């Protein structure tokens, strides 16, 4: 008889696809050969995303893993009439629900579980219809999960726009949250994206469990609050399995090290500020000018700045940066004035290799959770510059909850604008040896490096949670779908 399979339904995107695949591979290893993994592939919405996914699938298939297979779902029409990318992705997934149902029904082996992405609540309805346990793979923080679960209650309890509230918002397990730190999806309750957010939090209660890319030691108070029902008004929430950090480390290149890494090799330890705003992080010219001004007068601190150009197509889901034309984007003479202590890189850069380098002493990040986990894994303190989605909430937790960041003042109403003087102050605070604020962030980042690595070791908290997840899936049994 064929092995029971765990079906994965990932979405495209750097912080979504490979972490879920890595979690699936760990599930295989943890099952001791009792399970297989089937990955359902939705067509990516952009050519660049399709190329990335195809390359990653090819790598996995070439690795020779017998118990992991990939199945392509047919294309669906792209939705229209949405107010945000999160809602857009979720509507794509709702269109795929019949395809997911048909693909699972067509498997020739029993199905032990369906694991969906954060956006895939429609797939939880499919799992319930088929009688299969449905898990949400949550590639964000447990704090963000707590906010989502709390959102239906907040929607009923708060009568005004959250930004008009007096005082802070209470999320069990977290310090008081200022309304300015809420995700962009919560800031306009008249938009359908807000309705999507609240409906997602409500729909999550139909899950069997949450597989969260975090370590218990990083967010224990939040995980406890979810488990106690404090985020869901006393109703027991699905089980949380904190199994992170789950990070994808590609095979090392056979050729010589990347040019950015070679440049770092020539810099003193912990002397370089690394600036990178994610795979879709785009900075308009006014922000570029402020960063250049701050770096030009930030006390001579070294820097490595990944600066991308504007996208060719800015429709939802297609904001893919291009290679930057540095002479057009940067102030005249900037490269010459900073030559020797700074490198501006105009295309993709190997972020993990850079964060792992001993020369890097600080990280200006857009606060995507995957980038945060990488900085925690390598013990690099942070200057948070959130741009969109849940990133402002992540920035808040980095400063107020985890303590690994120096706060950066910004004007969210001006598209998250940061004045050069404020960025210069924050850079000095993070990087100067004499800064008490920076010293605390550096010390806390060094602690989290140890915590993250111990968590995934044999017997660590994340390793134990993964074993518990595997045992629970096997114990529940598998269903032969007809």
UniProtKB/Swiss-Prot annotation:
- Could you tell me which InterPro entries the record lists for this protein? UDP-glycosyltransf_plant, UDP_glucos_trans
- CDD domains attached here? GT1_Gtf-like
The catalysed reaction is: malvidin + UDP-alpha-D-galactose = malvidin 3-O-beta-D-galactoside + UDP + H(+)
Which coarse location class applies to the principal site listed for this UniProt protein? endoplasmic reticulum
Q: What is its EC number?
A: 2.4.1.-
An example Gene Ontology cellular component term from the record?
endoplasmic reticulum
- Keyword Metal-binding (UniProt): no
What is its EC class? transferase
Query: What does the record give under GO molecular function?
Result: UDP-glucosyltransferase activity; UDP-glycosyltransferase activity
| Tagged with keyword Nucleus | yes
| Binding residue positions for UDP | 279, 345, 349, 366, 370-371, 374
One Gene Ontology term of the biological-process aspect is: anthocyanin-containing compound biosynthetic process
Keywords assigned: Endoplasmic reticulum, Nucleus, Transferase
Q: Where is the active site?
A: 16, 117
Q: Name the pathway.
A: Pigment biosynthesis; anthocyanin biosynthesis
**What stretch or stretches form a coiled coil here?**
none
Cellular location(s) = Endoplasmic reticulum; Nucleus
According to its UniProt record, which protein family does this protein belong to? Belongs to the UDP-glycosyltransferase family.
Describe the task this protein carries out: UDP-glycosyltransferase which uses UDP-galactose and malvidin as substrates to catalyze the biosynthesis of malvidin 3-O-galactoside, an anthocyanin conferring purple pigmentation.
What's this protein's name? Malvidin galactosylase UGT88C3
- Organism equals Oryza sativa subsp. indica
């Amino acid at each position: 008889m064929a092995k029971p399979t765990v079906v994965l339904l990932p979405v495209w995107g750097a912080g979504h696809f490979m972490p879920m695949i890595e979690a699936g591979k760990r599930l295989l290893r943890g099952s001791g050969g009792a399970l297989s993994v089937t990955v359902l592939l939705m067509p990516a919405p952009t050519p660049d995303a399709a190329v990335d996914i195809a390359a990653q699938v090819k790598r996995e298939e070439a690795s020779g893993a017998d118990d992991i297979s990939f199945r392509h779902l047919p294309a669906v029409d792209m939705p229209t009439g949405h107010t945000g990318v999160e809602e857009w992705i979720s509507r794509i997934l709702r269109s795929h629900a019949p395809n997911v149902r048909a693909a699972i029904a067509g498997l020739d082996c029993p199905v032990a579980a369906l694991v969906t992405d954060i956006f895939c609540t429609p797939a939880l309805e499919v799992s319930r219809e088929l009688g299969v346990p449905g898990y949400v793979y949550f590639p964000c923080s447990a704090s963000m999960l707590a906010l989502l679960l709390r959102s239906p209650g907040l929607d009923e309890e708060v009568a005004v726009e959250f930004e008009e509230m007096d005082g802070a918002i209470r999320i069990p397990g977290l310090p008081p949250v200022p309304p300015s730190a809420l995700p962009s999806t919560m800031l306009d309750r008249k938009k359908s994206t807000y309705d999507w957010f609240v409906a997602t939090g409500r729909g999550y209660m139909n899950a069997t469990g949450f597989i969260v890319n975090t370590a218990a030691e990083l967010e224990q108070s939040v995980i406890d609050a979810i488990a106690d029902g404090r985020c869901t008004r006393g109703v027991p929430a699905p089980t949380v399995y904190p199994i992170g950090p789950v990070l994808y480390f590609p095979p090392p290149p056979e050729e010589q090290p990347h040019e950015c890494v070679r440049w770092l090799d020539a810099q003193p330890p912990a002397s370089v500020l690394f600036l990178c705003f994610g795979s879709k992080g785009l900075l308009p010219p006014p922000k570029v000018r402020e960063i250049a001004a701050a770096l030009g007068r930030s006390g001579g601190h070294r820097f490595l700045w990944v600066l991308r150009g504007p996208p060719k197509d800015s429709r939802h889901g297609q904001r893919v940066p291009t290679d930057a034309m540095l002479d057009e984007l940067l102030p005249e003479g900037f490269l010459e004035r900073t030559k020797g202590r700074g490198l501006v890189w105009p295309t993709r850069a190997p972020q993990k290799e850079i964060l792992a380098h001993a020369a890097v002493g600080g990280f200006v990040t857009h606060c995507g959770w995957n980038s945060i986990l990488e900085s925690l894994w390598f013990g690099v303190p942070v200057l948070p510059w959130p741009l969109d989605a849940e990133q402002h909430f992540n920035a808040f937790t980095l400063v107020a909850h985890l303590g690994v960041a120096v706060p950066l003042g910004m004007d969210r109403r001006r598209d998250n604008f940061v004045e050069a003087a404020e960025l210069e102050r924050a850079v000095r605070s993070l990087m100067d040896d004499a800064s008490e604020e920076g010293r605390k962030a550096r010390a806390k980042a060094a602690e989290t490096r140890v915590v993250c690595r111990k968590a995934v070791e044999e017997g660590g908290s994340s390793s134990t949670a993964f074993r518990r997840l595997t045992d629970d899936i096997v114990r529940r049994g598998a269903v032969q779908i007809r």
